[in-house]
Amino acid sequence: MAREYPLELYRNFGIMAHIDAGKTTTTERILFYTGKSHKLGEVHDGAATMDWMEQEQERGITITSAATTTFWERTEDGKTPQTPKHRFNIIDTPGHVDFTIEVERSLAVLDGAVCLLDANAGVEPQTETVWRQADRYKVPRIVFVNKMDKIGADFFNCVKMIKDRTGATPAPIALPIGAEDKLEGIIDLVTMKEWVYQGEDLGASWIIKDIRDELQAEAEEWRGKLIELAVEQDDEAMEAYLEGNEPDVPTLRALIRKGCLSMSFVPVTAGSAFKNKGVQMVLNSVIDYLPSPLDVPAYMGFAPGDETETRNIPRSADDAQPFAALAFKIMNDPFVGSLTFTRLYSGVLKKGDQMVNSTKGKRERVGRMMMMHAINREEIDEAFAGDIIALAGLKETTTGDTLCDPANQVVLETMTFPEPVIEIAVEPKTKADQEKMGLALARLAAEDPSFRVETDFESGQTIMKGMGELHLDILVDRMKREFKVEANIGAPQVAYRETISRAAEIDYTHKKQTGGTGQFARVKLQIDPTEPGQGYSFESKIVGGAVPKEYIPGVEKGIKSVMDSGPLAGFPVIDFKVALIDGAFHDVDSSVLAFEIAARAAMREGLKKAGAKLLEPIMKVEVVTPEEYTGGIIGDLTSRRGMVQGQDTRGNANVINAFVPLANMFGYINTLRSMSSGRAVFSMHFDHYDAVPQNISDEIQKKYA
């Protein structure tokens, strides 16, 4: 079976937004207009097609990014196609800050993105976070100012906020006609026509009109700004413009595309997905301005086993190249079992093919291959470069792994995942739950690399670690629903860390003589603090063979064995470096084990000598509140050991930014609701680790002693 759609007709894009900007509703409308779903699912009544986990439907927030394939051709009147049919692979991403990891994974495999803004709130904290992630992955994007029907909707304020908050240059390609309950449609600034939506057919039809007189001047002013930005993309167009010749419509579209792909500016359009207005303009813009796999530079990978990770193996969107793909998400499907969502970068994959997971050096075989629509699936026999598909039955593959042709191996990505900052103890209620819980936790951890499961050696408890209270709540909830595990959950605990405050040198000799072969090892270690966030490093500065090479791994193993449990309260030790500067050995009595024991004892002594101190996670907190509650909220944050960084106004609300220790933020949402009669909202994410004040450090040490 040959490729059905040429690559230039592919668009792999994601929809990214702050929680509540209307992402699921917008995706629903896209699926409805592109003919894939026949009844509109509203998040308000918990029936959206993309939100396929039961919980998402209850909580009304999107948790997992489902990948969907659908088709669209550009149309201006809703009836006449102006382009061939394009194939859209849409990845729905969550907007809640506890799920940033999901967004990170999906951005790694997207070519472009549609960023949704709430027309009233504009650029919100989570939008900024996701925007920065998209900048890091160099993802071109367009902006849809959604919810123009909301009270307080302000398109021009959103445009200004894009510039102020993200530093990007917004380029409106459409203006709303009216706002709030008077939203009639949009003005297309490229063709200079009005799109006026009619009637009850859920926005599937609209009328194209000339721009009404009272809006003509404003439309011309904004079109002028758009053209000035666009002609900067091309010298010839610039010269023609300076001579008084404006680009025609196809040229203007081509110039906007060029500017969008180079990220010189961001096209902005408007509407209301809920009121079925303006979504088709977004679909047209995806075709016109977002990249196809051919517009994206070749993906540079490195050879498996290359420690330097020199990226010198290109894989571009071409069926003739060797097969290479990235597994970016694992999901449990109640009918098919484990599904691995995979993006093909190059080559062709057929059912039954052998492939290699080059990240782990393991072989995998292609069983069932599926093209996913949010909840329905279509079995396929082969997939091509640029496709996003789901593979069933892979045994070894987890998120971020590369799958490739066994004869032409490459590793595409090393995804970095943040350290968890919050943990809870979980205990199964019955013996039967014990086994099910182990299986459930292993499955959930395979799906979500920002979630870790560990066993506390001393208490034997199972510890779940994650990115926030909501993150762990939802995982516990999924354990109950999907795996039918009943468990008791402990109170959330902070993931403290320990570090050192000064340099120290330790000379330690380990001797043991018990008849027969003894044990002997001497090590001299230099321990130094490093910059926050640098982690741990070890080097050997041994010259002249004072410690033979074969014993040095034992030294490092001994050092590492102490890192998991620091001297103050048994928390992991971070941000320090160790050098082995001298030592001594015995021809008969020395061994790797003897050096491991010596290094372990030296390290324990060294950490105490180097002034061990306790660190706690500090969260960046943003509270948005009506003005009358500002004073009380700031007072409350300060009482939680918070450092208020500043205030800002957004529309008619005040925005308070602060750094607050995580230990003092548990259950904050309830306090905030009662202080503000439910009108203030907050978001927080982990920012950095900082030293715990001495009096609190003493309390923590007593508690964990």
From Swiss-Prot:
Binding-site residues for GTP, renumbered to this chain: 17-24, 92-96, 146-149
Position of the signal peptide: none
Keyword GTP-binding assigned: yes
Cross-referenced HAMAP family: EF_G_EF_2_B
Entry protein name: Elongation factor G
GO biological process: ribosome disassembly
Domain of life from the UniProt record: Bacteria
Keywords: Cytoplasm, Elongation factor, GTP-binding, Nucleotide-binding, Protein biosynthesis
GO cellular component, one term: cytoplasm
CDD domains reported for this sequence: EF-G (cd01886), EFG_III (cd16262), EFG_mtEFG1_IV (cd01434), EFG_mtEFG_C (cd03713), EFG_mtEFG_II (cd04088)
Function comment: Catalyzes the GTP-dependent ribosomal translocation step during translation elongation. During this step, the ribosome changes from the pre-translocational (PRE) to the post-translocational (POST) state as the newly formed A-site-bound peptidyl-tRNA and P-site-bound deacylated tRNA move to the P and E sites, respectively. Catalyzes the coordinated movement of the two tRNA molecules, the mRNA and conformational changes in the ribosome.
Single GO term (MF): translation elongation factor activity
Major localisation: cytoplasm
Ranges of residues in domain tr-type G: 8-294
Location of the protein in the cell: Cytoplasm
Family membership: Belongs to the TRAFAC class translation factor GTPase superfamily. Classic translation factor GTPase family. EF-G/EF-2 subfamily.
